[in-house]
């Protein structure tokens, strides 16, 4: 049995579905194959625990002494598991093979591999965006997310945080060989940065090649955000690409967003109110390095085309190569500057506008690295009835189209949106 087959098997074990693929690969490298004939004891009651057993083939039975008052038998089959129990370092029951049986044994020395740390479980130091995406497991399909003190907030939970955390929660419930290829989400209520967010995952479908999940994000008992995601096992098929990456300066030649904003703050030709607003933006940390392709001297008081191009990548190297992690980070970054470009043709001096994301969709076409440069090309084809619509394409440095996106936002003039736990509309 090759490593890939072992990883695929482990990805179907409920206990392990909350772990990233890197953990499953490491577990597959250290598990021991154990074979038993019918009637053999796998473990004996009061025997010292030697690890966690995963049933690969065949069936087994859990037996307690027949003389006990509450004598019970529990059948075990493929994907079931057992190990440490309430009695600590000894097994609490006999486990007997009722057919020819094959188990994978994760020795106690490697039990730390079962611990959950984040989307990635690497022991390396995590960068800020990984800390933001960290989820605490509460139950099999329930996770708790937080808004760290150094996370971008803008007075409320940043929309990309909801997207990234919800997608991370969904990814933890899918076997590791299936990777998200698209998702659609809706922003329902403003999130409160001062309280945790509960992510409840619903397993809608698990097929041979595809899996579907829905996720509801809740605060104070109310659903503030919902996401539907589809996952697919890697397959061979037709390949073509019509979209061409536009010519742009290399990201290394462009100013980081923070440095560009610093220059705008001290530019005397710009309106004072605008410079004060920029100063506020600088104070908000953002874990993504952004480089705008065109000189951005807009005061948000002048009309401009509804288009934008910028390079982006995570600040710092991500601790893992797991595609689940990288796609969650790209999803996190995608909400910062997107449908708001629909405002560009309508700006004028003194105009006050509020913009809030309504829905957001992404399609992943090819593997991505969120800690390497990606070009985000955005166009807004229309705005109507207080809604702006934008489409986006993301290219890697090879010119490959890796992600397609759409977003719609509500755009309102002369409305002040106060941070609150209320409806977004």
UniProtKB/Swiss-Prot annotation:
SUPFAM superfamilies attached to this UniProt entry: cAMP-binding domain-like, Thioesterase/thiol ester dehydrase-isomerase
Provide the family line: Belongs to the C/M/P thioester hydrolase family.
Q: In which pathway does it act?
A: Lipid metabolism; fatty acid metabolism
**Could you tell me the gene encoding this protein?**
CNTE1
Annotated localization: Peroxisome matrix
GO CC annotations on file: peroxisomal matrix
**What Gene3D superfamilies does this protein map onto?**
Acyl-CoA thioesterase, double hotdog domain, Jelly Rolls
Listed Pfam families: 4HBT_3, 4HBT_3C, cNMP_binding
Q: Give the principal location in a single coarse category.
A: other
Q: What is this protein called?
A: Acyl-CoA hydrolase 1
Q: Which GO terms describe its biological process?
A: acyl-CoA metabolic process; fatty acid metabolic process; protein homotetramerization
Task: Give the keywords, sorted.
Answer: Fatty acid metabolism, Hydrolase, Lipid metabolism, Peroxisome
Q: How does it assemble?
A: Homotetramer.
Protein's job: Catalyzes the hydrolysis of acyl-CoAs into free fatty acids and coenzyme A (CoASH), regulating their respective intracellular levels. Active with both medium chain and long chain acyl-CoAs as substrates.
Q: What class of enzyme is it?
A: hydrolase
Which reaction equation describes what this protein catalyses? Answer: a fatty acyl-CoA + H2O = a fatty acid + CoA + H(+)
What are the catalytic residues?
335 (charge relay system), 357 (charge relay system), 407 (charge relay system)
This entry's Enzyme Commission designation comes to 3.1.2.20
Gene Ontology MF annotations: fatty acyl-CoA hydrolase activity; long-chain fatty acyl-CoA hydrolase activity; medium-chain fatty acyl-CoA hydrolase activity
Top-rank taxon: Eukaryota
Q: Where is this motif: Microbody targeting signal?
A: 423-425
Any idea which positions bind a nucleoside 3',5'-cyclic phosphate?
A: 15-83
NCBIfam families per the record?
tesB (TIGR00189)
């Amino acid at each position: 049995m090759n490593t890939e087959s072992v990883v695929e098997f482990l990805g179907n074990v409920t206990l392990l579905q909350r772990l990233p693929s890197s953990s499953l690969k490491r577990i597959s490298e250290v598990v021991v194959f154990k074979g038993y004939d019918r009637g053999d004891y796998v473990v004996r009651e009061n025997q010292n625990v030697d690890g966690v057993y995963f049933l690969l083939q065949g069936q087994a039975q859990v037996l307690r002494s027949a003389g006990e008052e509450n004598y019970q038998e529990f059948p075990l089959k493929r994907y079931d598991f057992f190990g440490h129990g309430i009695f600590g370092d000894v097994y609490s029951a006999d486990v007997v093979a009722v057919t020819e049986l094959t188990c994978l044994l994760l020795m106690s020395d490697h039990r730390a591999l079962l611990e959950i740390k984040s989307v990635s479980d690497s022991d390396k130091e995590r960068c800020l965006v990984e800390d933001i995406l960290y989820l605490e497991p509460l139950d099999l399909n329930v996770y708790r997310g937080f808004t760290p003190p150094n996370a971008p907030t803008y007075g409320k939970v940043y929309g990309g945080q909801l997207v990234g955390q919800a997608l991370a929660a969904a990814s933890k419930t899918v076997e590791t060989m299936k990777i998200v290829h698209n998702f659609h989400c809706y922003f329902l209520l403003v999130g409160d940065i001062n309280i945790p967010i509960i992510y409840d995952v619903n397993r809608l479908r698990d097929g041979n090649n595809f899996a579907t999940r829905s996720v509801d994000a809740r605060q104070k008992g109310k659903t503030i955000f919902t996401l539907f995601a589809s996952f697919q096992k890697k397959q061979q098929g037709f390949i073509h690409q019509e979209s061409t990456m536009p010519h742009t300066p290399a990201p290394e030649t462009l100013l980081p967003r923070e440095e560009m904003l610093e220059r705008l703050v001290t530019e005397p030709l710009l309106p004072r109110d605008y410079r004060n607003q920029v100063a506020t933006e600088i104070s908000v940390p953002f874990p993504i390095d952004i480089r705008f392709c065109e000189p951005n001297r807009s005061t948000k008081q002048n009309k401009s085309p509804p288009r934008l191009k910028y390079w982006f990548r995570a600040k710092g190297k991500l601790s893992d190569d797991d595609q689940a992690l990288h796609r969650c980070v790209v999803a996190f970054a995608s909400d910062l500057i997107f449908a708001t470009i629909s405002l560009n043709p309508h700006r004028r001096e003194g105009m006050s506008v509020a913009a809030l994301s309504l829905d957001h969709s992404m399609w992943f076409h090819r593997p991505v690295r969120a800690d390497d440069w990606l070009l985000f090309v955005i166009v807004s084809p229309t705005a109507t009835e207080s809604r702006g619509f934008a489409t986006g394409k993301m290219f890697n440095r090879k010119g490959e189209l890796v992600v397609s996106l759409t977003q719609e936002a509500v755009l309102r003039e002369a409305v002040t949106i106060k941070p609150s736990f209320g409806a977004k509309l």
